[in-house]
């Protein structure tokens, strides 16, 4: 039986014809039976694809033949094509939607004016040298940080990357502008952009972790400064860096430690992802996001003895 894997990758490089790159990438992925999501813009490419390991290796080889992608780094993760519903290859104004396509500048070396890149070991060395002066700044959506983050990290109150500019311009973080700020995200791409946006807004000493949380976790597992699970945007929904991880998330109903996000049972107008322990998710009466309307719907199902997950 063939072994399957997931690839995570990105490259910031000027692309004069994103549409041509889109057509080439779609044809390449289809020929290798890969599924996943790829975004392309004039700034570069951002992708996550899964499939048989030999097909993934062939994809890496072919993709690196393109001049702008010849130095692109690929991160391997557990999973495969089945973790994605289909193959999606799209052209967008941005490969990460911060809402600042005209502010971001890239050249053949990547993002212009971004934060200083630190290897995982250098992150630890910075903390050892500067202590509590160092601030970890989460570059992900606030929901992702519920199940894992760097120790004592600042977690901005954002639902999407589009919210970051208003958040950092709000004045909430002005006290960090003279401190060493280490931005981090899943694989590094969001912080390539976020760090440059922060520098443009007066943050004087900004860093980013090479390869993001994934690279840091691969090197240090659960023995470093990372705590908990890593949220991922596929069917797995979370991954860990070894079996000795700590569950830092808590069920919204009973406060039991959990790293499992579940959808609210109100399928018509909610379906919000919230943290629920197995027991509370199994109980129809508590399988909701705690909004009043959703709680009422759950109570109605429970009273009628109906479980929406049980098919006849």
UniProtKB/Swiss-Prot annotation:
<protein>
    <recommendedName>
        <fullName>tRNA uridine(34) hydroxylase</fullName>
        <ecNumber>1.14.-.-</ecNumber>
    </recommendedName>
</protein>
<dbReference type="Pfam" id="PF00581">
    <property type="entry name" value="Rhodanese"/>
</dbReference>
<dbReference type="InterPro" id="IPR040503">
    <property type="entry name" value="TRHO_N"/>
</dbReference>
<dbReference type="InterPro" id="IPR036873">
    <property type="entry name" value="Rhodanese-like_dom_sf"/>
</dbReference>
<comment type="function">
    <text>Catalyzes oxygen-dependent 5-hydroxyuridine (ho5U) modification at position 34 in tRNAs.</text>
</comment>
<dbReference type="InterPro" id="IPR001763">
    <property type="entry name" value="Rhodanese-like_dom"/>
</dbReference>
<dbReference type="GO" id="GO:0006400">
    <property type="term" value="P:tRNA modification"/>
</dbReference>
<keyword id="KW-0560">Oxidoreductase</keyword>
<dbReference type="Pfam" id="PF12368">
    <property type="entry name" value="Rhodanese_C"/>
</dbReference>
<keyword id="KW-0819">tRNA processing</keyword>
<feature type="domain" description="Rhodanese">
    <location>
        <begin position="130"/>
        <end position="225"/>
    </location>
</feature>
<dbReference type="Pfam" id="PF17773">
    <property type="entry name" value="UPF0176_N"/>
</dbReference>
<dbReference type="InterPro" id="IPR022111">
    <property type="entry name" value="Rhodanese_C"/>
</dbReference>
<feature type="active site" description="Cysteine persulfide intermediate">
    <location>
        <position position="185"/>
    </location>
</feature>
<comment type="similarity">
    <text>Belongs to the TrhO family.</text>
</comment>
<dbReference type="GO" id="GO:0016705">
    <property type="term" value="F:oxidoreductase activity, acting on paired donors, with incorporation or reduction of molecular oxygen"/>
</dbReference>
<dbReference type="InterPro" id="IPR020936">
    <property type="entry name" value="TrhO"/>
</dbReference>
């Amino acid at each position: 039986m063939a072994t399957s894997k997931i690839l995570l990758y990105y490259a910031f490089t000027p692309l004069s014809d994103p549409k041509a790159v889109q057509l080439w990438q779609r044809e390449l992925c289809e020929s290798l039976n890969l599924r996943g999501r790829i975004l392309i813009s004039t700034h570069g490419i951002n992708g996550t694809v899964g499939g048989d390991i030999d097909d993934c290796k062939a994809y890496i080889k072919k993709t690196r033949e393109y001049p702008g992608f010849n130095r692109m780094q690929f991160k391997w993760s557990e999973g495969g094509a089945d973790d994605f519903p289909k193959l999606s290859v799209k052209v967008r104004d941005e490969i990460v939607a911060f809402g600042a396509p005209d502010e971001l500048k890239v050249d053949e070396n990547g993002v212009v004016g971004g934060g200083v890149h630190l290897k995982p070991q250098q992150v630890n060395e910075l903390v050892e040298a500067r202590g509590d002066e160092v601030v970890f700044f989460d570059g992900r959506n606030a929901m992702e940080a519920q199940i894992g983050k760097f120790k004592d990290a600042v977690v901005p109150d954002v639902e999407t990357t589009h919210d970051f500019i208003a958040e950092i311009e709000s004045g909430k973080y002005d006290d960090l502008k003279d401190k060493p700020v280490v931005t981090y995200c899943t694989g590094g791409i969001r912080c390539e952009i976020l760090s440059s946006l922060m520098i443009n807004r007066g943050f004087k000493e900004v860093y980013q972790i090479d390869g993001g949380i994934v690279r840091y976790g691969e090197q240090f597992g659960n023995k470093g400064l990372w705590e908990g699970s890593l949220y991922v945007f596929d069917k797995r929904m979370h991954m860990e860096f070894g079996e000795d991880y700590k569950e830092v998330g808590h069920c919204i109903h009973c406060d039991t430690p959990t790293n499992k996000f579940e959808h609210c049972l109100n399928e018509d107008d909610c379906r919000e992802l919230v943290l629920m322990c197995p027991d509370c998710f199994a109980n129809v009466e508590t399988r909701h996001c705690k909004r009043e309307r959703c709680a009422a719907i759950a109570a109605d199902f429970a009273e009628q003895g109906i479980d929406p997950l049980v098919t006849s």
